[in-house]
Swiss-Prot record:
The gene is Mrpl50. Component of the mitochondrial ribosome large subunit (39S) which comprises a 16S rRNA and about 50 distinct proteins. PANTHER family: 39A RIBOSOMAL PROTEIN L50, MITOCHONDRIAL, LARGE RIBOSOMAL SUBUNIT PROTEIN ML50. It comes from Mus musculus (Mouse). Keywords: Mitochondrion, Ribonucleoprotein, Ribosomal protein. It holds the Pfam family Ribosomal_L50. This is Large ribosomal subunit protein mL50. It is found in: Mitochondrion.
Amino acid sequence: MAALIVSRLARRGWLWKLPLATRREFWSRSRKEKEPVVAETVEEVKKEPVLVCPPLRSRAYTPPSDLQSRLESHIKEVLGSSLPNNWQDISLDDGHMKFRLLAGLADGLGHAVPNSRLHQMCRVRDVLDFYNVPVQDKSKFDELVASNLPPNLKISWSY
């Protein structure tokens, strides 16, 4: 096929000559030439996570005596300076507010709410009830060893 094809069109008695290009030449005009892509160097900034994953085994936790005042002051930081009289009935429907509250309490008290209990934290009262329960770092077998056993019963770990 030739590079140029001359077509003759008869229009109103005139003879027109139009140069027609090949398909490749026709479509190459509309294509934009691709510019080489230059990769920019981006400096990575590493941020420390807000809440570090707790260890696999739970640590012992004893609720502090001033737990209610700590919780109230932390809620004031998260929600604002003024709290209603029934601040324990405040709903935790907002996910961001719930996260800030629980993350701050986990850092301050050293005891995090496990993932399996997060859906149960609907109100501030639920959070207060969770943090009022002491946690022991012993298994049932450790408690049996430490308890006063009868002389005919002995637990040996190495067998």
